[in-house]
Structure formats: C-alpha cells, structure tokens
C-alpha cells in the first residue's frame, strides 16, 4: 500500500516540476512534456505559440544551431513555409478571425524577430522572385548555377526593387564565369551598360576570360575596344595577357605581337605592378603624368621626414625618382613566361619566322624562365618550316649540352630537325641523327620520323634504304590506311631507277590495308611510272585490268586521264593498234584536258 502512495506522490511531483509560469503573464501555464498536453487547458482561446517550447524568453534574440550527424539545423524545419505564419489555412481560431490584418502584422513581426539574417533575406527574396520570375530566365547550362546566384541574378534584373551596383554585377559575373555561361555573361555586361552602370577592370576581365576559353577572338576584340574607347579604362597586365592568349589560340600572330609590344611599352602596367601609384578616376594619365605622380608621392614622403639636411634628402630622392623612371623605361622585365609562350606559338602558327626567333632568344637571355617543351617544339617547328637547319642544329646542340634542357628533347624536336634537313637534302646529317641521336636519348622513332627520312630518300632515288625503312614500318605496325605518304615516298624512290618490283610490293601492301579507291589510284599511277621507266609495259596493262575490275565493282570510282595516258603509251609501245585506237577515241569523246604526255602521243600518232 505504501508503494502505491509513493507512486502517486512521485507522479504529482513530476507534474508540478514540469510546469513553468510565463514571465509576462503569470496565469498562463504551458507544458514541456507532450504526454501531459491535455491535462490542463488554462486558456482555450489562446493562440498557439510560434516558438518551440524549449526556448526561453531571454534567448529570443539569438536562435541557436544544433548539429546532428555533421549536419546543422535550426528551430525551423527545412520544409517550413513562411506563409503559415499568416494564418491562411482553414483552421484559424476565433481569436485570429477577429482581427486578421493585425494578426498578420503581429505574427510576421514576431516571426522576423526569431529569424536570423539569412532567413530574413530568403523570406524577402522569395516574394520578389515570385513577382519577377516571368521577366527574365536564367540560362540553363550543363553545370547549372547555385540557387543563391540565380536569386542574385534575378534580383539584379528586377531593377525597380534592387539598386544594382558594379560590385553586385561583378559577383554575379564571377559565378557565371566559373560555370562557363558565355551568353549570360554577355547579357549581364549588356545590362550593366543599359542601366548606366560602368563596368570596371574586373568586369572586363571576367567576360574576356570566357571569350578566351571559347576562342571567340572577334567578340573579345570588340569588348577590348569598348573598354578602352568607350569606358576609358586602361588595360592592366591580366587584360593584355588574356587578349594575347586569345589571338594566339586563333593563330593571329600579327595581333598577338601588336598587343605584346603594347604591353611591353605601356608604362601604366609597370606602374600598377611595382610603383603602386594610384590612377585617376578617368584613367587618362600619360607619361608626363606618371613622372609627375612619382615626384609628387616622393615629395610627400619627404615632408614627413624630420631631417635637417634638405640638400642630401633632395639628392637621394632625385636618385630614387630617376631609378623608378628607368624601371618604367626598361619594360622587358615585366613580361611573364606565359606571354612569351603564347606569342611564340602565334608566330609559329602564322609562320612569322623572324619575330618568333626574336622572342625566343629574348626569353633565353632574360634568365628568369626555363622554356618548356611546348616552347621548344614550336620554335623547332618554325625553323623546320623555313628550312633553317643551321639554327636548328645550333639550338639542338645547346639543348643537348645543357643538362637542364636535355631532358626536354623529345621525338617531336628530332622530327622537326630532320624536317629542316630534308628541305636541303642534308642526308648525311639526317642519317647521323637517325642512327645515333634516337638511341642516345632513348627515343623511339614514330610514324612521322620514318616518313621524313623516306622523303629524303625519295629525293635522292635511294630505293634500297627507302624500301628497308618501309619494311621496318611494316614490322613495327606503323603502316595504316590513314596515311598514304610513306607508300608514295617509297614508290617515288623507285620511279627513276626502274625497280618496279619494289613498287608492286608497296602497292600490294596498300591493297591489303584497304585504302580508299582514290588513294589506290594514286599509287597505281606512281607504280605505272616506275614500270614505264623499266620498260615493263605488259605490267602496266595488267594493272589497268585491275583498275577496270575495281571500277565495275564500285561505280563511283573513275579512272582519270593520267592513268589512261600511261595505258595509251603501253598500247603504242606494244604495237596494240586496235586497243590504242579504241582508247584514243574514248579520251576524245570524254573531252579530257590532255596532259603534255598525252598530247605528245596524239601528235606522234596522227596517221596511226
């Protein structure tokens, strides 16, 4: 029986302990425990409290954030709806029905009181976005923008409610630039100008970097001119660098060189990077203003010094000013490696030989940077296209003798060196590189390496070495139906020597690799030339029969006038009169434009 009394006493104590009086109205009591919810109802008409019951009155100004499983949440559920505080549902009580408008204001103010700053911003922004959602659509890219930036951009477009500034636009443009949305970026900068909001260097840097990314040199050039002429903004180093890169990627070497020299000779770029002289608002300073600003800044520093020896101070300051002016005049030191690399690449694409060599040697003499493989490949390619094998050998020997640069030598550099030698048929030097340098540097020749050497052998009619290289390519599986040049060079090395059997072998390999019909016809014609020089006219007729069979199988394949000329010569030399007359009539009926050899045969056989 005592246990029963103790049980009831414990329950009563527990109920009393769970009660708390409100600090504002002592008669209003509410419970913390859910299972005591319906025990006492002090005031039925009382509105439901908006704040969760575990909050004390003294903590209303600060809403704590709790953490659970490394994720944060606040007192409001993530799915909460702000409109619920307006009591628009059907379950409004009698108290709210009496003064609905007052209740809305009261509850919304109370709700805002318990919100932190980010929740207040979301609460206001959602209403604005609902009104302005139909005015402008945000570009949907493959990597869509975060929701926060979408809201920022929508707010920028709703200019009636938001006072957009250059800083706000730059923030949105930065997000757009990271996502790569060029059309949205151009739309943003157009909106800035339409609202008379002046873009700054950051704005132009963001939009120009996207133009550089997508190789839109025309758009970048228009924006660059607008920045200088319309907005009166002097480009800084980064703007110059972006434009040089843009011109280099599109192969416009002349424009890349023009901007490179402007960057070199622009004193304000040097000033912004090292002298730290503030620009005027309209950015219209000239070289005299630069010197005046330097003197003015140094005179201000001079006034702050408490030194009685004015003459010595003046001399020291004058020397200091002179050194700064000399630094501005000596602008080559400010050019960074990336700009040298881009302008050298542009010179190579545009085949500007002298300019490319000039900038490459400047880069070497500066001593600040070590050229990368990219720069070496471009400069050797430029040398090979112009056939300057002497300078190519000079650069190559310097690379090879320098342990820091030797590691940069690769197959592409050796190929370009061989290409420069092939233009002048320097076979001895080319063979020395082929036999020694590849092995010494532990490099394996690729398809292009064999092709360059085959071209050299074809020029000097060295069919034996050419055929040997061709067999090596076949063994190393470097031959394919995508590249016909090794086949042509090998056959051409046999044309003047009359070694037709080598040419026939190369032709059979090409047929096994399933070359296209037109490519095969080219190889057939070169093989027929080799047969003509070796007086093997019967082989020419046999090859012609193969071409007839190919034409019957593929109606799109047509034998050209060069092939018919070789066959006509074979009929003439073999005294096959009727076949000669028939083929001659076919040539006349088709109204071909006769090559010199065919015209000669016609003139020699008028009475045939």
UniProtKB/Swiss-Prot annotation:
UniProt keyword Aminoacyl-tRNA synthetase, yes or no: no
Keywords: Apicoplast, Plastid, Repeat, RNA-binding, Transit peptide
Statement: the UniProt record of this protein carries the keyword Repeat: yes
Listed InterPro entries: Pentatricopeptide_rpt (IPR002885), TPR-like_helical_dom_sf (IPR011990)
Protein's recorded name: Pentatricopeptide repeat-containing protein 1, apicoplast
Intervals holding PPR repeats: 165-199, 200-230, 236-270, 336-370, 372-402, 410-445, 446-480
Organism of provenance: Plasmodium falciparum (isolate 3D7)
Cellular component, GO annotation: apicoplast
PANTHER family from the UniProt entry: OS03G0856100 PROTEIN, OS12G0638900 PROTEIN
Subcellular location: Plastid, Apicoplast
NCBIfam families found in the cross-reference section: PPR
Similarity section: Belongs to the PPR family. P subfamily.
Its job: Binds to apicoplast RNA transcripts, preferentially to the motif UUAU, and protects RNA transcripts from degradation by ribonuclease.
Any one Gene Ontology molecular-function term assigned to this protein's record: RNA binding
Main localisation: plastid
Domain of life: Eukaryota
